Amino acid sequence: VFSFEQRDGRTDKWGGNFTVGSSDIGLTAEGPLGEKSSVLLSARRSYLQFLFDAIGLPFLPTYNDFQYKQKIKINQKNELTIIGLGAIDEFGLNLQDDTSAFQQYILGNLPFQTQWNYTIGASYKHYRERGYSTIVASRNMLNNRAYKYIDNDDSKESNLIFDYTSREMENKFRYEETLDIKRFRVKGGINYELARYTNNTYQLIPVGTDVITVDYQSELPLQKWGAFVQSSTSIFDYRLTLSFGLRADANNYSTSMQNLLDQLSPRFSASYKLTDTWSANFNTGIYYQ
């Protein structure tokens, strides 16, 4: 199980670094924005397309990604975190005149591809004496595009034999409460998600002496909601940690999935600290997708 978190930007002064690797180049900058805020910015771009072109490969990938994080400490009990992630990926073709027969075959079948995605969100936390509240709102989107022309000649629209565009969009909201009650930590919350998937596909498929035209547009809107509660504690001089949780999820994809009680997911885990560097772990549960 992995857990990734963006680190906070520096609060003392501005700084940054510039990196050059074997396949990409990157820039990072961070520093304070006033007395109560810090920001972290980064951008990276690959130059694999130049390497692939130099060694004569028929495809030319280019990757770009961006990150942004700002943390605002409103006061001792309230803080706001804003994040942004984005990426633009392009998969071009190396249309040189001196390609081999094998490369020409690959070029005749590989489509041009582009993909971009982003995630933006904000997290607000309010701290109390024995716990804190968390409110999270976010939006993410993924766009995929692939197309192909006969002999890679896009001078005529009639040469188009494949055109595919899909989009996935999700708007999410989550509210959580975390409480410390004696030796127990209790966490509970609710979530709601509004999602939409669209697909536009055009393709000419040769079948014998005939050509079948596939041309359709589809859309799938979806709403999801859920709730969870979890409690954990440590016993035996904090060597044994026990955790029990219960989660329920539902959505409007079909009537059989709209009742939270029909998708109850109990979970249990235990971790025993054998030494300072070794521990034994046990996990079990029921999961729904």
Regions found by a protein language model. Name each.
Residues V1-G16, L27, G31:
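N-terminal periplasmic accessory domains that precede
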Residues R10-D12, P32-Q115:
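Periplasmic-side early beta-strands and strand-to-turn transitions of outer-membrane beta-barrels
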Residues N17-G26, L57-L60, Y253-L261:
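Solvent-exposed loop/turn segments connecting transmembrane beta-strands
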Residues I25-K36, L40-R44, N64-I72, A227-V229, ...:
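Feature captures outer-membrane beta-barrel proteins of Gram-negative bacteria and organelles
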Residues L57-T62, Q96-I106, I150-L160, Q203-I212, ...:
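Flexible, surface-exposed loop regions and adjacent strand-edge segments
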Residues K71-D89, P111-M257:
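Face-selective signature of the C-terminal outer-membrane beta-barrel domain
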Residues G92, Q96-F102, N143-R145, T198-V207, ...:
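Surface-exposed extracellular loop regions of Gram-negative outer-membrane beta-barrel proteins
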